[in-house]
Amino acid sequence: MIIESRIEKGNPVVGMETTVFVHGLPRKEAIELFRRAKEISREKGFQLVVIGILKGKIIVGMSEEELETMMREGADKIGTREIPIAVAKGKNAATTVSATIFLSRRIGIEVVVTGGTGGVHPGRVDVSQDLTEMASSRTILVSSGIKSILDVEATFEMLETLEIPLVGFKTDEFPLFFSRKSGRRVPRVESVEEVLKIYETMREIGFEKTLMVLNPVPEEYEVPHDEIERLLEKIELEAEGKEVTPFLLKKLAEMTNGRTLKANLALLEENVKLAGEIAMKLKR
C-alpha cells in the first residue's frame, strides 16, 4: 500500500504537516513541539496525525522516531504537485499545507492544523500551492494567517479571487503569523459552534473550498508586523524556490534573539488545541 494510515477508528482526527518540523524549526524545538502536540491531543481526547512520506510511503500518523529519521536523512519539502514523484522515487518528503490538505481529504480527515500558510512572495512570480489546494478542497484549516514574510496585499487579494472563505476566531483582523494585526478585516466568530455552522453550510451547498479559521498568536508572544518588515528589508536573500521560507524564518529568529521562534511555538500549540476542539465537535 502506498498509504499507511494509523488512524484509530472512532476518534476525532486532526491532520498536521511535516514541513513545520523538518524545515520550519530547529531540531530540538521540533521534537519538543511534536511531543507537546501529542500530549495535548491525548489530554483533550482527539488524535493528531502528522503526515509525511518516508522512503516513498505516505504515512498518516508518523512516530517521533520516523520524524527524527526524516530530519537526520533529509527530506524534500513538497506541495501537492510533488506527491506522486516523491512516492514513485522512494523519497523522504515533508508535506506543506497543500500536500497535507490533499492527503487528509483522501482519507477522510476534515480538520488540518498549521502555523501559517503560504501565499504570494514579494517581488517575483512565486505563488504557493497552499492557495490553489485550499481553493479546491473542502476542509477546515486552523492557522495564524499567512506567514509574515509574504506579500500581504497580494496574498489577501488572491484569497478573495480564489473564493477561499476565512473567519477570525475571536478577532476582527487577519493575523500575520507572528503578528496579531494586519489592518485587514475578516468576519469574526466567537465559538467553535459558529465555525461548524459555516462549514456545514459549505457542505450543504457543495462549496468545495477550505475554510480558514484564523487564530492569532498569543498576545504575549506577538512580534509586531512593522518590526518584521524592517528586519526583512535588511536580509539579503540567499535561497530560492521552496527554500526561501525556511531561510527567512531562520534569519528572523536570529535577528530577534529567538522571539519569532517562541512566537511560532506558542501559536502552533494554541492552533493544535483549537483544531482538536473543532474536530471533536465535528465528530459529534
Curated annotation (Swiss-Prot):
HAMAP family: PsiMP_glycosidase (MF_01876). Mn(2+) binds at D126. This is Pseudouridine-5'-phosphate glycosidase. Belongs to the pseudouridine-5'-phosphate glycosidase family. It comes from the Bacteria. Catalyzes the reversible cleavage of pseudouridine 5'-phosphate (PsiMP) to ribose 5-phosphate and uracil. Functions biologically in the cleavage direction, as part of a pseudouridine degradation pathway. The active site is at E17, K147. GO terms for cellular component: cytoplasm. Binds 1 Mn(2+) ion per subunit. Homotrimer. It comes from Thermotoga petrophila (strain ATCC BAA-488 / DSM 13995 / JCM 10881 / RKU-1). Its cofactor is Mn(2+). Keywords: Glycosidase, Hydrolase, Lyase, Manganese, Metal-binding.
